[in-house]
Every structure is written in structure tokens, then in C-alpha cells.
Amino acid sequence: MRLSFHPRRLAATLAVGAISLAASLAPPALAPVSAKVFDPETFTLDNGLEVVVIANSRAPIVTHMVWYRVGAADEPPGKSGIAHFLEHLMFKGTETMAPGEFSEIIARNGGQENAFTSWDYTAYFQTIAKDRLELMMRFEADRMANLRLSDAVVDPERDVILEERRSRTDNEPGAQLSEMVTASLFLNHPYGIPIIGWEHEMRGLTTEDALAFYERWYAPNNAILVVAGDVTAEEVRGLAERYYGVIPARDLPDRVRPSEPKQLAPRRVTLESPRVRQPSLWIDYLAPSYGAGASEHAYPLQVLDEILGGGTTSRLYRRLVVEQAVAAGAGSGYGAGSVDLTNYRFYVTPRPGIELDAAEAALRAQIEALLESGVTEEEVAAAKTRMRSSAIYARDSLSTGANILGRSLATGQSVEDVESWPERIEAVTAEQVNAAARAVFDVRRSVTGVLLPKPTS
């Protein structure tokens, strides 16, 4: 089963997708604010393929990733789920490889692989011994240019993604509610359509639909190659030119995405299910990202998210769980790394014996207190210290750097945006955080999601 899609808000993010650490971890000695995060080397092939190399010689392994600047928000109307479906079908063979052969070879060589689809990008990766990097490039370049599909492989895989939807969404009340909340938050933008697709449209996806999407978007000049591990940029350049460099560029279409209208009224979505044991609630606000809306608020919102939702020492957890004892869990979530607008989420789960209405009232009181009194300079300073520490820890993992840089470039950011993230976070002031909160937390641009138990009859 592929790691096929992930939610808009990842629990761990750094800057262009921020990485948060448990508050219990002792921070390392902080490097100067101007220190590089990953210090990658970059170059572009003649056919437009961007290449990023993160040298890390701690172990003789590499992570090899290919990111395409296309995702579920780029699908034709009526074809929801085709980006994710194509991700599955990319493992079904080429002119020279049988279905599943790539995966079998990776497994025989002791490697790991996976792929994932978001609204903005699709990515494929392998982690393997460094002396198998050339093999990975040969196979990945082959399916970039030579994917071959037939109804014989497409039809059974359609059943696979339908079962994936049933298991991950239709049988999970929280996922169902999240789908409805997101559809209510984005009134016009395709972010309101689930990445996996609507079931009735998924059933109609065809071989021709998949090939058309592939031929439209999968090209070297719409891709980013990221290699992290025990390699040099020159080694990667030679291999990339040999395998990817021979693939011709394509004429790419514009990414046409409708924008959001002015939102005038709050919305509320309630879902009851006998599968729900404990009620919960969240409030989503339409929010700017690095690339859309009032983007000057993106970095302050990241600091605010650390203050409000950064673990068991955060403001919301401390006040609602520890001090008031009305909640079993409470926090917030915000990710700035999307092409278009994003969301800022508050959530609360009441403590057993506490009514959901009481927990909701306590959460809303905290939001009102934030808007009235703001955050303090001390809270901002502590949050920035924790966030800078997270950037240092992020260097330890091959996949973390490859993921952050790939995601950033795929959503319109630059390598410099990633490398300068600690400086940009350090420059955030309490005044900027409070201004961002006042700008974003407008109830008219919000959706409240309520998940309730439903007694079985």
C-alpha cells in the first residue's frame, strides 16, 4: 500500500513546512541565526530539471526524490482523484519494466520506497545504499518518460484506491468530518476537493484520463530532483545528466486555479457516528500562506502556532487541559507551505464528563483573549528559541532535508527561503504576531467542525 496522500496540516513542519519537536527535548546549543540549515548545492539541467544535493556522509546511504509540480488541485473538473490515481499507476511498468518490478528490485537491494500526493505536488522517493543511486536514477527517469498503461493494470488499481478511500475516509468519522470542513472552508478553490477524490468521480477514472494527466504534467521541466546523503554534487550531476538529461522538456500548461470569493458568514458542520467514542471540535480559519494572501503574516503565524499549540507547554494545552481541566487535548495547527491559501486550525477534545459546549466555550474564550490581549514578548522569544532548535535537529535526517527542500521548491519557495528560515523567524516580533492573529481570526472566514457520538439504535 502506498503512502498515498497526506493531510494539509502535517504534525511536523519546518518553515516551508516546519519541524516541531516535543517540548521535553532539551535544545542543543544554538548556532548563529545566520547559519545555514541544510547548505545544499543546486543546479539545473538543460531540459529544465532542477537538482538539489544535500551532502551528508554520516552513513553510506542516499535518499533520492523526484517531485512534480502538480497535485490534486490541478485536476480537470470531474476527474477528482486522478493525481493520486496516477501516483499509484506510476508503479505499473514501462516499456522495459514489468508492473511492480521497480519495487521488487528496490526491496532486493535493501532499500525503501514510497510516494505521496498533495494538492500541490506529487513525490516519489527511495532510500538505499549509495552504490545503488545510479540504479534508482535509471528507473525513476524511465518512468518519467516511458510509462505504459493498459486497462488490464488500471482497472484493478482503481479498485485499490476505492478501497483506500473506504478504509481511510468512509470508515473514519474524523476523516469524513475533515473532508466536509475543508469543502466548506474553500468555497471555490479546488483545495476543497479531497486529494483521494470523490468516490463517484473516482469510479469513472480511466486509462485515458491517467495518461492524459501524465502527458500534460510529468516532464523534467516540471520536476525537482533531490538527492541527500553520502554523495557529492558532481557525482549527482553526472548521473542526472546521463539519465534525466536525455528526457526532452515539454510545453507545460498554466496552473489555472479559481480563487476564493470574499467570505461573509461562518459555517458549522456537525457529524454524528456510532464509531465516535469521544466528541471533539475544531475551528478552521482561512489563512495566508507563503505564496498567497497576506503572506507577510505567514512567519508570525508560525510563531503563533508554536505559542498556542507547540506541545504540552503551549498556551492552549496549559490553560484548557492543565489549569481549567475542561479538555483532554487542545492545540492549534498551521502550515504555510502551500501554493494558495491555507488554513489555521484550533482543536479541542473535552475531558470525560465535560460537555463539548463547555470545551468549545473555553476554546473560544482563549481566542478572544488572544485577540484582545495578544501574546507577550516572552512567549515569542521562547517560541523562537524552540523553533530555531528544530532547524538544527532537522539536519540530522536525510529524508527531512530532502522533504523540506523538495516541498518548498514544489510550492514556489526557493532554497534561500529554506536556508534563511531561522533568520526570518528570529525577526518576528510580538506586534507582528498579534497583527497576524487579528487579521486571520475573523469568524466570518471560519468553519467549525463538530464530531459527536451517535448511540446505536
Residue ranges and their predicted role:
Residues 33-39, 43-60:
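N- or domain-start disorder-to-order transition segments that initiate the globular core
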Residues 48, 57-106, 283, 294-308, ...:
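Active/ligand-binding-proximal structured segments within catalytic/core domains
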Residues 1-7:
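N-terminal secretory signal peptides that target proteins for export/translocation
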Residues 166, 183, 252-313:
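His/Glu-based metal-binding/catalytic segments typifying zinc-dependent metallopeptidases
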Residues 63-66, 280-285, 345, 447-449:
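Active-site-flanking beta-strand signature of metal-NTP-handling nucleotidyl enzymes
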Residues 56-59, 219, 276-277:
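Short strand-connecting beta-turns/loops that link adjacent beta-strands
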